[in-house]
């Protein structure tokens, strides 16, 4: 292995060597090449709109036993399909196929799945422009198209 240059005027060479070595650090490489943004279906944005394709039930991981209510959503911006969780009791009753929904991340670490719902990284917070929370608690009615 070649030794690092020493001496008074070795700064430029040392700097260039450090720059080359940084590419072996995986975090640096992912950040510089934008791999996390490319892998993210929402393209790095915090929220996205989509069309509901179907309602699905996702089984919870062990030791819990439940069917978590989710929907398959096709994003408008790039056509990618994602699974989004429906928070709160009875939220599934307010969502039909072909509704327009707004989705956001679930808030888990590193953008991953949260809690006992495997493979679900996003949640629905609006249906046809109305807050899902307000629909569930009965403050607002779902607008008819």
Curated annotation (Swiss-Prot):
GO terms for biological process: translation. Gene3D superfamilies: Nucleic acid-binding proteins. The keyword ATP-binding does not apply. Keywords: Ribonucleoprotein, Ribosomal protein, RNA-binding, rRNA-binding. GO terms for molecular function: rRNA binding; structural constituent of ribosome. SUPFAM superfamilies: Nucleic acid-binding proteins. One of its GO terms (cellular component) is small ribosomal subunit. Pfam families: Ribosom_S12_S23. InterPro entries: NA-bd_OB-fold, Ribosomal_uS12, Ribosomal_uS12_arc, Ribosomal_uS12_euk/arc. HAMAP family: Ribosomal_uS12_A. Belongs to the universal ribosomal protein uS12 family. Part of the 30S ribosomal subunit. With S4 and S5 plays an important role in translational accuracy. Located at the interface of the 30S and 50S subunits. This is Small ribosomal subunit protein uS12.
């Amino acid at each position: 292995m070649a030794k690092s240059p020493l001496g008074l005027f070795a700064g430029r060479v040392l700097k260039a060597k450090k720059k080359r070595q940084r590419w072996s650090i995986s975090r640096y490489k992912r950040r510089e090449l934008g791999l996390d943004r490319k892998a993210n279906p929402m393209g790095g944005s915090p929220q996205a709109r989509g069309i509901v394709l179907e309602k699905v039930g996702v089984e919870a991981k062990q030791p819990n036993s439940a069917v978590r209510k989710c929907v398959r959503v096709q994003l408008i911006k790039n056509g990618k399909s994602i699974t989004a969780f429906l928070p709160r009791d009875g939220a599934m009753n307010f969502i039909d196929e072909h509704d327009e929904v707004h989705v956001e991340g679930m808030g888990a670490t590193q953008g991953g799945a949260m809690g006992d719902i495997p493979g679900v990284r996003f949640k629905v917070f609006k249906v046809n422009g109305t807050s899902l929370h307000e629909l569930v608690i009965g403050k607002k009615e779902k607008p008819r198209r």
